[in-house]
């Protein structure tokens, strides 16, 4: 008599495990990507706050804010004394930073009175778009929602 013992998984057992892993992955992946986007948004908010502090220092020294652009692949002049990206390096950054006049109607707003700093995401963020902060303290998003500042 030969006593053979067969060990292993059947195909149905393997398919059940694959199905369970697929269900877990479909739940975990959107939560993971959402937390990554929120983390990058936090990086943009911190960078805007730091840039606004630098702008206020510049205002006290020169009696005006500094206007510069860093979007659409435009190179920022070397004379800008501020960091124009959100991360430690440009390649590791989630946002490009720029500064300009505050939006507003008549009477005209001067650059010595108000500045708006803008963080433009390098990778699109449809929920928030651009993060914007003015020297008057107004926090806005280009999408119109305030979820980006939460």
How does the language model describe each region?
Residues 1-35:
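N-terminal single-pass transmembrane signal-anchor helix
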Residues 6, 38-42, 46, 106-110, ...:
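Residues at secondary-structure transition points
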Residues 11-14, 55, 119:
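Conserved hydrophobic beta-strand within the GNAT/NAT acetyltransferase core sheet
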Residues 19-22, 45, 52:
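Hydrophobic beta-strand core positions in alpha/beta domains
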Residues 27, 34, 57, 63, ...:
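Flexible, active-site-adjacent loop/turn segments at secondary-structure boundaries
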Residues 31, 43, 47, 114:
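Amphipathic alpha-helical recognition patches that constitute DNA-binding helices
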Residues 38-42, 49-71:
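Alpha-helix exit/C-cap motif
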Residues 60-150:
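Periplasmic/extracellular, small/polar-rich flexible segments of pilin-like filament-forming proteins
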């Amino acid at each position: 008599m030969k006593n053979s013992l067969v060990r292993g998984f059947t195909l149905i057992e393997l398919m059940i495990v694959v199905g369970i892993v697929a269900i877990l992955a479909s739940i975990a992946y959107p939560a993971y990507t959402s937390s990554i986007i929120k983390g990058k948004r936090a990086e943009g908010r911190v960078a805007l706050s730091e840039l606004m502090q630098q702008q206020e220092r510049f205002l006290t020294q020169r009696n005006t804010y500094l206007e510069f652009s860093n979007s659409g692949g435009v190179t920022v002049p070397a004379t800008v004394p501020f960091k124009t990206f959100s991360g430690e390096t440009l390649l590791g950054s989630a946002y490009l930073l720029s500064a300009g006049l505050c939006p507003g109607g008549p009477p005209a707003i001067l650059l010595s009175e108000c500045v708006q700093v803008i963080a433009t995401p390098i990778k699109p963020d449809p929920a928030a778009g651009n993060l914007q902060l003015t020297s008057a303290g107004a926090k806005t998003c280009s999408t119109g929602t305030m979820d980006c500042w939460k």
